[in-house]
């Protein structure tokens, strides 16, 4: 049984593991919530999902905290009933609030519990479950340190087509002329990037100006098109990118946020990046994620508060493809492309040996 929900940062890694399990003949059941994206996304990928009633607390009104004991007890009972009905051999928590009651009841039911933490700073659910889990799987070394005997670093599961891209040495060596930049703000876009990029491009002489593909998010596409037009620059402006592997393969540089999956994909693809962490992320975990690449000279960490059109334009005009290739090679050296299979292997070992 896989438990994950709330955001794509938990659900998509869970789906990657689910597919790896399914490929080995496993029956996979998902535990999620009715209001999370997993309720529709998981069935679309062909997996059975069981739903409980539970939600996160961060940012909620004080009354939500008063109701927490009742809501948690109810969710635990629902999880217990599902566990008794489905009888999984092992339970894997991938983070997000549905994993909390499910993880608690898995342990109380005598089921082996593994948790996987995608970010460099652990989320609240995994901080709690780490104390009772049989195994703790991490995307980044050092995220959890007080359970040393139970920890294994597996990396974050990424899509196979990204992990199988040619090496940076092969890709970058064939290129000449203007840089090719990919700007990604996530499925909802990043307004700070949408504002700064067209203005920065307008400050670069036409004969030096990079080719740009800019994913804006559906809501912001019209405004982005207007901004590019007002600044007299052009680009391939899209609301959403389905096949990221193709764009990673063809670009010299990615400008993006620093979600855990983005970091894993940049490393797996082997591509240089400017990382602009979302400044309001819980516990500022995106900055911690970004440092994993920047500390290894595989990316530039650029706080949003310091990102201006002028500074970005100056950086792009002085940057060379050779420098970007070096960053891309460094990124690829940090990749863990077998992460999904590693998670499955640990699950299999735990089934065979017990908690």
Swiss-Prot record:
Q: Does the keyword Cell division apply?
A: yes
Q: Name one GO cellular component term.
A: plasma membrane
Q: In which pathway does it act?
A: Cell wall biogenesis; peptidoglycan biosynthesis
Pfam families associated with the record: Glyco_tran_28_C, Glyco_transf_28
- One GO molecular function term? UDP-N-acetyl-D-glucosamine:N-acetylmuramoyl-L-alanyl-D-glutamyl-meso-2,6-diaminopimelyl-D-alanyl-D-alanine-diphosphoundecaprenol 4-beta-N-acetylglucosaminlytransferase activity
Question: Might you give the EC number(s) for this enzyme?
Answer: 2.4.1.227
The UniProt catalytic activity note for this protein reads: di-trans,octa-cis-undecaprenyl diphospho-N-acetyl-alpha-D-muramoyl-L-alanyl-D-glutamyl-meso-2,6-diaminopimeloyl-D-alanyl-D-alanine + UDP-N-acetyl-alpha-D-glucosamine = di-trans,octa-cis-undecaprenyl diphospho-[N-acetyl-alpha-D-glucosaminyl-(1->4)]-N-acetyl-alpha-D-muramoyl-L-alanyl-D-glutamyl-meso-2,6-diaminopimeloyl-D-alanyl-D-alanine + UDP + H(+)
Where found, per UniProt? Cell inner membrane
Q: Where does UDP-N-acetyl-alpha-D-glucosamine bind?
A: 7-9, 119, 159, 187, 241, 286
- Coiled-coil segments: none
Q: Keywords assigned by UniProt? A: Cell cycle, Cell division, Cell inner membrane, Cell membrane, Cell shape, Cell wall biogenesis/degradation, Glycosyltransferase, Membrane, Peptidoglycan synthesis, Transferase
GO BP terms in the entry: carbohydrate metabolic process; cell division; cell wall organization; lipid glycosylation; peptidoglycan biosynthetic process; regulation of cell shape
The way this protein sits in the membrane is described as: Peripheral membrane protein
- Provide the family line: Belongs to the glycosyltransferase 28 family. MurG subfamily.
Reported function:
Cell wall formation. Catalyzes the transfer of a GlcNAc subunit on undecaprenyl-pyrophosphoryl-MurNAc-pentapeptide (lipid intermediate I) to form undecaprenyl-pyrophosphoryl-MurNAc-(pentapeptide)GlcNAc (lipid intermediate II).
This chain belongs to the protein called UDP-N-acetylglucosamine--N-acetylmuramyl-(pentapeptide) pyrophosphoryl-undecaprenol N-acetylglucosamine transferase
- The protein's organism comes out as Nitrosomonas eutropha (strain DSM 101675 / C91 / Nm57)
Q: What is the lineage of its organism?
A: Bacteria, Pseudomonadati, Pseudomonadota, Betaproteobacteria, Nitrosomonadales
Recorded name of the encoding gene: murG
């Amino acid at each position: 049984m896989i438990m994950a929900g709330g955001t794509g940062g938990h659900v998509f890694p869970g789906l990657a593991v689910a597919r790896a399990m399914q490929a080995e003949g496993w029956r996979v059941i998902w535990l999620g919530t009715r209001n999370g994206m997993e309720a529709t996304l998981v069935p679309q990928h062909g997996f059975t999902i069981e739903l409980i009633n539970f939600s996160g607390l961060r940012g909620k009104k004080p009354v939500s905290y008063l109701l927490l004991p009742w809501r948690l007890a109810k969710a635990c009972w629902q999880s217990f009933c599902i566990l008794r009905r489905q009888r999984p051999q092992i339970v894997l928590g991938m983070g997000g609030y549905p994993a909390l009651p499910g993880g608690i009841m898995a342990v109380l039911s005598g089921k082996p519990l593994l948790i996987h933490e995608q970010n460099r700073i652990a989320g609240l659910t995994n901080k709690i479950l780490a104390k009772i889990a049989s195994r703790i799987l991490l995307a980044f070394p050092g995220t959890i340190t007080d359970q040393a005997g139970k920890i294994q670093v597996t990396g974050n599961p990424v899509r196979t087509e990204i992990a199988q891209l040619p090496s940076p040495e092969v890709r970058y060596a064939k290129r000449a002329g203007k840089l090719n930049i990919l700007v990604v703000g996530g499925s909802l876009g990043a307004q700070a990037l949408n504002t700064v990029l067209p203005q920065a491009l307008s400050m670069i002489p036409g004969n030096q100006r990079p080719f740009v593909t800019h994913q804006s998010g559906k809501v912001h596409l019209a405004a982005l098109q207007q901004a590019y037009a007002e600044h007299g620059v052009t680009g391939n402006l899209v609301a959403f990118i389905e096949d990221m592997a193709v764009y990673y393969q063809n670009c010299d540089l990615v400008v993006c946020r620093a979600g855990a999956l983005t970091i894993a994909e940049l490393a797996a693809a082997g591509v240089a990046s400017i990382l602009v962490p979302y400044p309001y992320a819980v516990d500022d975990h995106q900055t911690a994620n970004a440092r994993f690449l920047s500390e290894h000279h595989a990316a530039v960490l650029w706080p949003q508060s310091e990102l201006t059109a002028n500074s970005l334009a100056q950086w792009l005009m002085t940057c060379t493809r050779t420098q970007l290739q070096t960053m891309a090679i460094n990124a690829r050296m940090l990749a863990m492309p077998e992460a999904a299979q590693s998670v499955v292997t640990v699950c299999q070992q735990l089934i065979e040996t017990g908690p």
